[in-house]
Amino acid sequence: RCVSETAPGPGNPDQAGNCLKIVKDLFNKIPILGVCLGHQIIGQVFGAKIVNAKKLMHGKTSKILHNKIGIFKGLKNNLVGTRYHSLIIDRKTLNKDFIITAKTKDNVIMGIMHKNYNVHGVQFHPESISTKEGMKLIKNFLKYK
């Protein structure tokens, strides 16, 4: 089983080198988990606009509300996620082939999942020590079919 993780920033998807091309070329061939900038890259590849967040979130934590599906299955709701970003996926432009799997209380998209392919994105950092359930989320991705 092959796994790809598009790494976090800095910058925006247009400055991400070959990451846009990698997602375009491989989304239907291998599982992809996009973290932070990787999440935004997935959104942009599928037509979403990436916009400035109303609030900068560099090194801050937020409670993440999720729908307990996909890579969030079995995780506590209101999990604390560590955030390092100033850009977000514009909810109105998210491709309808994606499900919003997680958000903040102020409705910022924190997780997406493609309906037909093993493609997931999270705006927060599951690998951060401050994201207590982060390793469970990553394990869920590794096991997800």
Place the predicted regions along the sequence by residue.
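Short, small-residue-biased leader/transition segments that mark boundaries at the very start
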Residues: R1-V3
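Acyltransferase
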Residues: I129-K145
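Active-site-proximal beta-strand elements of phosphoester/diester hydrolases
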Residues: G81, V119-F124
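Histidine-centered divalent metal-coordination motifs
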Residues: C36, H85, H125
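Cysteine-nucleophile active-site neighborhood
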Residues: T6-G74, N78-V80, I138-K139
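Catalytic beta-strand/loop cores that center a nucleophilic Ser/Cys/Thr
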Residues: G70-N116
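Conserved hydrophobic/aromatic beta-strand scaffold that supports enzyme active sites
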Residues: T61-K63, I109-G111, G121
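Glycine-rich nucleotide phosphate-binding loop and flanking beta-alpha elements
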Residues: G11-N12, D90, S130
